[in-house]
């Protein structure tokens, strides 16, 4: 029908807009023209905000949080929020409806960890090394028609590394994935 065609065009236009925004973000990062506006904040506040938004947008998943308060970092709050949101968005994409997505904040002596864990499809061991590469999408994710450009995790990596942080990833096929952002404390 005409309405279905219009809806498909709208959806594709939105996808193209998102792709252009992601490419511009990475281009600014490559050219080192993006400024970080660091401030001190509790990572728990950002996680609570993201999970609250996701619970409204996506009632089909069960979101759980485990927040270790006073987990202060010095970072660009908007960029940090974007990185965490990318991980939560991926968990939503690859976790069956009705399943749980856990987001934790843990404090160590010199770091704060943000852990996003799901019961999703998991990532094959041979593909783990590539998940942060630009445009990379695993065979499983390409087969699922979940959409996406393969740029989200490369953007998250750029943000985290620019703040002196790094990632740890643990994943098993058909069991789920745990991605941890480890940020230095302020």
Describe each region flagged by the PLM.
Residues 91-92:
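Short helix-loop "hinge" at the ATP-lid/N-box region of the Bergerat-fold HATPase_c
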Residues 80-84, 112:
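A residue-level detector for a conserved hydrophobic packing site
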Residues 37-52:
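A conserved beta-strand-to-alpha-helix junction within the catalytic ATP-binding
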Residues 123-137:
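Short conserved segment of the HATPase_c
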Residues 11-16:
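Short alpha-helical segment of the dimerization/phosphotransfer core of two-component systems
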Residues 164-165:
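Conserved glycine-rich
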Residues 37-40, 60-72:
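Conserved catalytic submotifs in the C-terminal HATPase_c
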């Amino acid at each position: 029908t005409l309405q279905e065609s219009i809806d498909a065009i709208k959806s594709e236009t939105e996808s193209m807009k998102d792709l252009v925004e992601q490419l511009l973000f990475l281009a600014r990062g490559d050219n080192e023209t993006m400024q970080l506006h660091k401030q001190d904040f509790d990572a728990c506040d950002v996680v609570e905000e993201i999970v609250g938004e996701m619970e409204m947008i996506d009632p089909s998943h069960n979101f759980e949080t485990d927040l270790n308060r006073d987990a202060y970092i010095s970072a660009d709050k908007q960029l940090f929020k974007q990185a965490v949101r990318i991980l939560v968005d991926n968990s939503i994409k690859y976790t069956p409806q009705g399943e749980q997505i856990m987001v934790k904040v843990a404090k160590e002596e010199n770091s704060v960890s943000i852990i996003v864990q799901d019961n999703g499809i998991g990532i094959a061991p041979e593909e783990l090394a590539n998940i942060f590469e630009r445009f990379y999408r695993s065979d499983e994710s390409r087969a699922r028609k979940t959409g996406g450009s393969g740029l989200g995790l490369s953007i998250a990596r750029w943000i985290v590394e620019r703040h002196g942080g790094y990632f740890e990833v643990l994943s098993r096929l058909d069991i789920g994935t745990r991605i941890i952002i480890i940020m230095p404390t302020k």
